Amino acid sequence: MNEKEELHLYHVSLQKQRNYVHSCIGHFVDYRHHHIRAQGGSVEGGKKGSKWRKQLQICMATQTQVELYDVEEGRLRRLFTRTVFGTITGLSSVVADGRSVLIVVGDSGKMSVLRFKYEGGRVRLEALFNEPLSRSGVRRLSPQAHVSVDPQGRCVLLSAMERNKVCYLMDVKQGELQVSSPLEANRPNYVTMQTAACDVAFDNPIFASLEIDLADGAKYLFFYMLDLGLNHMAKVADFELGDGSANFIMSVPDLEQYGINTKAGGPDDGDPDAIVPFVLMGFDNYVSLKDLRGRYDINVQIPTRKLSQKTIITAGTVQKLKRDFFMLLQSNHGDLYKVKILPDEKTASPVVTISYFDTIPQAQNLHIFKHGYMFANSEYGNSYLYQFENLDDEEESMLTSVMPGRRLIIEPRTVLKNLLVADKLALVNPILSSQLTERVPLTIATSTLGDVRLFTAGVNFMDIISSPLPAAPLDIWTVATNGSRFHKLLFIALQESTMILKIAAGTVEELELPHNPFVIAQDKTVLIAHMGGQSIIQVTENKMVHIIENRDESYESKLEWFPPAGICILKASSNSTQLILALSNNEVVYFEIGSNESLNELQDRIEVEERITALAIGNGNRSDYMIIASVDSTVKVYSLKVQDQANFLEVVSMQVLVSPASSLQLASSGGSLCLHIGLDSGVYVRSKLDRNTGELFDVRTKYLGTKPVEISLLLDMNPYINEEVDDEGEEEEEQDDEESLGGPHSRLVPCVVLHSGKTWISYELDSSLFIRPLLNDQSLKRVAQFTSNEIQRNGCCSISSAGFLVIGRIGTFRNNDCWFQESSLALPDSEDSVNGNELENDEKDPDALLEEKQKVNSSIGKLIIPDPDDIKLFYYCEYNEVENSCRVSLFKQGISYKHENSTEAFQLIPDCRPSTATIARFGLDMKHLVISTVNGVLKTFVIRITKAANNRRFELLALHDTVAGSTIHAMCPFHDKLLVPLANAVVLYGLGKKQLLKKSISYLPTSITKIVALDQWNGTRVAVGDIHESVTLLHFDERKNQFIPVADDVTKRHVTVVKFVDECTVIGGDRFGNIWLLRLPLEYDRLIKEGVDSYLLTLNTGIPSNIRECVFKWQLLNHFYINDIPMSFHLIASPQMADRASILYAGLQGTIGYLIPLITRREIEFFDLLEQAMRDADHLFYLDQENRLNDTSELNDGADEEGSVIDRRFPSVQKKRKIPEGAYSLVGRDAMMYRSYYNPVRHVTDGDLCEQFLELYPSEKNFLAARVDNRSVQEIERRINDMRTNCM
């Protein structure tokens, strides 16, 4: 088979990893007005602002993602995110010329120095240096495991896990950061556990290191000094630690500044003026203060929990005050300890005190900011921003080094005392299991250590008011008059009448007028619009009324216009000055309003051959075009340009559609005119309209359902609105956004709401089109913009298909960086069940976020079990370690079922710690829940579900327990039995009266020792995933009632999950972060179906079984490295009304990814070319720079030819400033090598890499577009965008 005819996949990450393993604080970028004023000039600056700013920004990184947050306002505000196609192993910051820059090391084998900059309304990250360190890859001897930065920013120490250390000097000369050649300090046969940079002011930089001697396993404390005069790195002190439990080290501020004597005196004290560095070390159950000269070894016990295991320190940070300092340490139990070093009253020698402070989730890093906040980068689950409420100094809970042997037992708090949760970063890490619960909108339920999270691909619509209407409504409009930006009147069209509501003081009530000029009965309203300064236009089927609002808020009719006798008005559209009416005789009437509020009709009319189905005119003050759609499936563009009288009311372009248009909207978006078309066939079409010629181009389509598509237009929407800010804080939030110097948070965009079988929303962000479901419990028929004093941004009012008036707000517009709307399922407990509440969404209850109290979570072993019949229903099992019980709950669409015989919403199963579970039928109508415990017992329950009006109940009836004999890690139903792997056999269990009965035992090849994944296909085949022997295909012989191994793999794979894609194809993942597809060749499949027994008899039986355990071998179709451990796969037939089936997967570290089949040769070739261009971007741009820098005459002339990218991106190229090699990948990592970390990537296009094309500068896009078969930039962007729009 030709390679182009094989299966090709397009991979894109919908959510990146969420395990932030690295973090550092600093002031990385100036993006606010007061930042600019502080540095005295330009946004790009850095030369004038040499003084240090407050470090109120935090940079966090997973292994593949860098993100920047600002905490200046006491909340986490994301400024930047960027995918790095490499594995980040170390991250730190260094202050250079008043601003912080990033130091990044990873598997690229380089030390990368990166700088954030604010440009064009957005934050970008650029590479300053990529200094080679070692070979690529994560290696034991590569100096990439530990990063320590001198507090004065003079040098950086990089340490390998074993032996190697290198130090780089850093300096700023003429406003440019300079990095020296590396200085080495190698110690063979020593493993480095941790390093720390000591506080020595402007003395020679000193670093402390905790290391292990491989010869005898002893642990040592080493001090290394960089001699700035000799430019040499050397060890200056080493101390063997008698206690081998040392595991933590952190530097201590210069104690001399706080009146503490650091020089004990002695003949070998060295320079008396030198600062003596101290470090605090963590051991089992105690901490110790040590110094460079070995004079001090001050110990103090750590307050420990009652009956707890050993307590060790895992994280710590230092906070310097004006005349004091303290350190916060965290133990492996999550307890925080406050450590202070004070001078002794008599000798002024250091005295260490430690006291219990609070308990928070276990953190990777702790960071304290100058304005009284602390960020805890949690190891698992959510990360929190805390505010200090007080600095507790209770002496009764304090231990001191004066009595080093004294111990203290503490009772950890379950409610915070000294800290207050100010904000949180909702993270899903780890993902233990997942389940697809809905296809439209695409919804995934995931279980983590904390709770169940729902990920929904859509945009939130938050209900504020919902009220039933007396009759079935047809349409809705809002009107703001007399120049006010707040809407005053609300019109609802019914079948033969119109309802008029008045909006005032936060209430909506019916408008009562003594003399009502509006048509409210015996006619159907087609359009209500505000025109001119104080005019309201009402268009009904039988007339058009021009109404004026007076200053006393009364209304009077100024004009009534009637169509010819026997003719009715079908459609109407307007803007501030223009009005068009479509009549039933296929004529279009055009009006304009003058400055004196008079409405003037143009005598010439447009005549259309076919019946008009829709028409539209551009929003704003005046439109140059109007659009008319006819029943002949065409859309025609007519010119309304005053300066082009020859073509006035003439057709300038036309578009042929697949079916007649049911709705049209013309709106300006991002500097271009966009025509939105809804078709009778359920297809939505978006075309762009050329402002000069009126031609239609850049056509995008999306199938939304079987019903006709109606379109509602919403203008001036804030795509980045903070959903967690309430109405009172909304105005303050807008002012904060405006301070971002016109950044993306202050830009307003239009959007259209699409009404079909479900409600959708279409909008453009950063030149990409998004068509997403609008998330609401009710399907909306029409939507109109709604702005009031209470809802000042993104407000809208709508009528639902159930006949309700709904007033609410549209939430944050999701983009590629934030694809899902995330919410939490409130897990039922005894208190919740009584109140009956189910779905807890942080966005709906912001007060719960700000006043959240930290509690210790003792639940582990969480499983999501899908129901075989209902995709929306799933069972949730969680094990409580304290009670040694398993709790089972049922959820459907975010609502939990109540228990049949109690008020609880769960059922407890005592003495049960589950390892896996599944649903089986056993040939009966009733379903059975089978739970496998870690003790090797199969617990079988009958599931009984009762449904009544607004009341769903369930009960688990225990049948019996079956002893399996060993822990079972996977099982699945097979026909009317249960398939269970035991050792190197698979067993079919049937239902018995007292236990499950073994109906069949099939032995597998001897190489299979531990089966961890299992899946079956239509009761004929089973895929078995072994912990290290890849996947084996079993064929079920019904005559023998046995499973026959027919195919295995030629490569060892450490399987974590396996799933059938079709009868001959499986997809799987392994614990090294690889995803692969294996297929049984068709000729082998034919032989198996013809009869595998007869084929086996023809084979040469002389071949030993250990060489050929199975007669057939899998063929590798696809292979891809995702840098996360796949935990589950889901095959989705038509997600979000997509045009093809796809595969969704969830990774352990929070990754949610998507694999889309490329179905045409043209798609495959295009994305192959684009991916290759992006892979070669580093080389192409660097080569282009070298060629142009060698051409001196071209540089002097300042030529700016197409394809030249360097001078556009870096104006300083004129001064010979060179872009480092590998700058466009940031860290200099080859993308092909990264995706082929363990095995070569095969037939998978890296969509994440292709989408980086959208982030490039325009000149860079042009440069690379020439390498993609000379395609235009617009076509490349459209093809990339279409993969998300039409396929997911």
Swiss-Prot record:
Source organism superkingdom: Eukaryota
GO biological process: mRNA splicing, via spliceosome; spliceosomal complex assembly
Keywords of the record: mRNA processing, mRNA splicing, Nucleus, Spliceosome
Single GO MF descriptor: U2 snRNA binding
GO CC terms: nucleus; Prp19 complex; U2 snRNP; U2-type prespliceosome
Keyword presence, Ribosomal protein: no
Feature: compositional bias, Acidic residues: 725-740
Residue numbers spanned by region Disordered: 725-744
Subcellular location, record wording: Nucleus
Family: Belongs to the RSE1 family.
Function: Involved in pre-mRNA splicing and cell cycle control.
Oligomer and partners: Associated with the spliceosome.
Protein name (record): Pre-mRNA-splicing factor RSE1
Provenance organism: Eremothecium gossypii (strain ATCC 10895 / CBS 109.51 / FGSC 9923 / NRRL Y-1056)
